[in-house]
Structures are given as C-alpha cells and as structure tokens.
C-alpha cells in the first residue's frame, strides 16, 4: 500500500494535495433527518445524555458512516459541552435549545470561572474519539469540533439563543473590559479542549463561530478575531500539523477576516459564490463547502448540477465538499444518499460533464 493510500482521503485534502475529487462530509450529518437517529432520540430524549454518554454518542456519530460512508466522521457533541468544566452549567431543552441559568453578566461571575481540566470534566470525549478512530480506520477522517469564544460568550451572556444578541452587544459596547476577560478565558478553554480532542484521536478539528456573522466587520476585529487567533496560536504551539477549520454562518461580510484567524481552512457558507470565496481568500487558503442545504430538497439532477458547479469553482486542490450549513430537519434521506454517492463519483462526472 502506498503511503498516500494510508492517509485518510479528507486529511490529504486538508493538507493541500491535488486530488481527483474532493472528500465529502456534511455538517450535522448525524441528526434528526435520519430515522435511526429519531428512533434513538425517542428512547433517549435528553440531548445531553445522547452527546455525553459515550456509547450513545459513538452510535450516533457512526449512523451516517454506516449509511453513506462519508470521508469525514465528526464526533456527535455540542459546542457548549465543555462549559460546565469552567463553571458555566447549561441544559438543552428539546425544541427550545440551550439554556444557561444564571447567565454570565458580572465581573464576580467571571472571576469565579476556573481552568478547564478535560480529563476530569469531559472524559467521555476521549472514549468517543478513540472508538471512532478504531471503527473507521483509514477509511474516513475523524473530526473533532468546538465552539469559538465569541459564540460561546454569546450563549453564556444571553443565557439562550437570541435573534438580536442585544445583551452581549450591550456588554460589548458599554462594558467591553468585562467581556474581553470572559472571551480570553473562553479562548484558553477552547484551546485546551482542541488539544485534548487531538490527543484523543481527532485528525481535524472544526471551530464553529456560529454567531460571529452577527457582528459588524469592525466589531468582529475586536471581539471575535483576536480570540479565534488566541485559540489557534495555542493549539499550533503544541499541534502544528493538525488542520483546523473555521466556520461562521452568514460570513460573507467577514470572509477575508476569517482568513486572518490562522486556521488552515475556511468553511464557506452558501451565501458566497465558491469562485468568489476562492478569489477573496487567496489561493493559499483551503476551503470547505458550500452547497445550500436547501438543494437537498431538489431533484437529483439539480443536486448533481450543484455538486459539479461547486467542485469546478473550488478547484482540485485544498477543497472539502460540504454544505454551507448543517443538514436541515426533514431533508429526504434518499437525497442525502444520492448526494454522497454523486460526490464520491465526482471525478467521473467532471470528465463527462
């Protein structure tokens, strides 16, 4: 077996190799659109149990692997999972989302946050990642994932999901010193968590700054970018060769700024044309994405055309095919299967198209 054949396909793309087709996986590929997941959810209704019980999280992570054989298998978890480990408890209410009560809004609360010890507070992550590596071998790449400091702070300060982010923006624009302390502590936690995931078996780690797209570009430069950089800098000091991906929803206005974070790859959302994203980010930056999740509700010929279009625009080096957001609830499983089958035969499509 050649050395390149021993390296998982997605990892080769993340390292910048020229490939016949891009590797493919989907954000939220394990989730509610799959009947096997819904059946398991009915039996175990607590999201935290599903994501923090290692056996359940392993099973859920592997459901799309068994069904579709994606080139990437991502750990089933939540971006808030590490927060209790520094003193921010949370719960997840089905159909309502995360709740943090009390929310973090005072200097005293921030002073009481403590350093993150993943072995003590998230030991199940080690079991999940080590088992996933054993299960998929070199046939797929195991991805870890974390939330970025701004997005974690948004949940912690707001206390829940928000449409306006008025509470954290009030803190940012009236008491910035307090928020900067929180962001720095969260960045240290995230960096420690990324390193832990890599040590436990993650071969690539994606950082989600889901709500950074709610910031103006000038505020992104103050409250999001420096803390993304803090995470990346700390991780690269100890794990320089592990590819890091950054994803932001609604990122068209800050795309170039994302490239300054220090990550190896930018996951582009569907609001930016992939050819434009390539141009704006520069040829050295690798990209992931960026098909509109709504495309998976379309006809098979439409799905096929969008796959080919995206691959052509991204080029044959440094691209991972993905959606521009997570798989939507209600997406037909047959269309997801068709998406993966088509993507994995894209080299043939590109020759004949």
From Swiss-Prot:
InterPro entries: UROD/MetE-like_sf (IPR038071), Uroporphyrinogen_deCO2ase_HemE (IPR006361), Uroporphyrinogen_deCOase (IPR000257)
GO function terms (MF aspect): uroporphyrinogen decarboxylase activity
Residues binding substrate: 28-32, 78, 155, 210, 325
Keywords: Cytoplasm, Decarboxylase, Lyase, Porphyrin biosynthesis
Site (Transition state stabilizer): 78
GO BP annotations listed: protoporphyrinogen IX biosynthetic process
Associated pathway: Porphyrin-containing compound metabolism; protoporphyrin-IX biosynthesis; coproporphyrinogen-III from 5-aminolevulinate: step 4/4
Superkingdom classification of source: Bacteria
One GO location term (cellular component): cytoplasm
Entry-linked Gene3D superfamilies: 3.20.20.210
EC number: 4.1.1.37
Compartment(s) where it occurs, according to its Swiss-Prot or TrEMBL record: Cytoplasm
Catalytic function, reaction form: uroporphyrinogen III + 4 H(+) = coproporphyrinogen III + 4 CO2
PROSITE patterns cross-referenced by the UniProt entry: UROD_1, UROD_2
Cross-referenced Pfam families: URO-D
Keyword Hydrolase found: no
Enzyme kind, highest EC tier: lyase
Subunit structure: Homodimer.
Family: Belongs to the uroporphyrinogen decarboxylase family.
Annotated function: Catalyzes the decarboxylation of four acetate groups of uroporphyrinogen-III to yield coproporphyrinogen-III.
Name of this chain's protein: Uroporphyrinogen decarboxylase
Gene: hemE
């Amino acid at each position: 077996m050649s050395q390149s054949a021993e390296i998982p396909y997605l990892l080769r793309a993340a390292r910048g190799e020229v490939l016949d087709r891009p590797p493919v996986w989907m954000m939220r590929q394990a989730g509610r659109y799959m009947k096997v997941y819904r059946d398991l959810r009915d039996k175990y209704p607590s999201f935290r149990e599903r994501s923090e019980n290692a056996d359940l999280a392993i099973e859920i992570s592997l459901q799309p692997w068994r069904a579709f054989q994606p080139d990437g298998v991502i750990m089933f978890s939540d971006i808030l999972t590490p927060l209790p480990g520094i003193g921010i408890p949370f719960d997840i209410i089905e159909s309502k989302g995360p709740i943090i009560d009390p929310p973090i809004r005072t200097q005293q609360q921030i002073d009481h946050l403590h350093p993150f010890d993943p072995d003590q507070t998230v030991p199940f992550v080690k079991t999940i990642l080590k088992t996933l590596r054993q299960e998929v071998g070199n046939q797929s790449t195991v991805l870890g994932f974390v939330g970025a400091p701004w997005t974690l702070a948004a949940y912690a300060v707001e206390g829940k999901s928000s449409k306006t982010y008025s509470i954290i923006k009030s803190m940012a624009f009236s008491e910035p010193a307090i928020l900067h302390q929180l962001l720095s502590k969260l960045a240290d936690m995230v960096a420690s968590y990324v390193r832990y995931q890599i040590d436990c078996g993650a071969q690539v780690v994606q950082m989600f700054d889901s709500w950074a797209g709610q910031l103006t570009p000038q505020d992104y430069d103050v409250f999001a970018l420096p803390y993304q950089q803090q995470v990346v800098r700390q991780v690269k000091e100890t794990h320089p060769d592990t590819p890091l991906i950054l994803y932001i929803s609604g990122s068209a206005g800050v795309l170039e700024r994302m490239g300054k974070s220090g990550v190896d790859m930018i996951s582009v959302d569907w609001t930016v044309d992939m050819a434009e994203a390539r141009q704006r980010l520069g040829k050295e930056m690798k990209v992931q994405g960026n098909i509109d999740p709504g495309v998976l509700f379309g006809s098979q010929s439409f799905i096929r055309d969008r796959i080919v279009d995206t691959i052509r625009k991204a080029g044959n080096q440094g691209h991972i095919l993905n959606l521009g957001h997570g798989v939507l609830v209600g997406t037909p499983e047959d269309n997801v299967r068709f998406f993966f089958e088509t993507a994995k035969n894209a080299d043939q499509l590109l020759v004949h198209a």
